């Protein structure tokens, strides 16, 4: 009698799988992402006024440092200079302060929890590109408080010993290893606040 639910065919001692449509398919889990925005109204006129032309200059250098095994950037560690990255300047308004506080309370990238500025708020910004030494400039700034942000990618080289074989002379046994290198890519978010107190001054800042 033929078995209509048979999923294997046996011929000459060989087993062949036969495709049978499953009655149930488990759906993939969707990555849950939470996005938060400040619950404060954005004053575009205030932001526009803060970004109007002045006569002060903000000059800075952007860099990061490689974290140690405890996830800490050592104070005396070598600088990794920000080569050709975009630095964004935002005016520090009440809306921005609400966003910054909300980010401290809610942001958790591992749990896919993000805090964003509104599109209108992010539109009021200035941008600069660093040179190969990490230097950048924002000219013609008015007195005020500003927030700087950039994302600095870099590659960390690590090493390990790969076992290649064993030799024995009958008395002693020796294991041999080759030193191998591999790379890990990182991207650090670097930020700083800067205050321009008066027109005509040059304010220097370290963005790290």
Specify the residue positions occupied by each region the protein language model found.
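Primarily secretory-pathway and cell-envelope proteins
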Residues: 23-108, 157-208
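A short tyrosine-centered beta-strand micro-motif
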Residues: 141-150
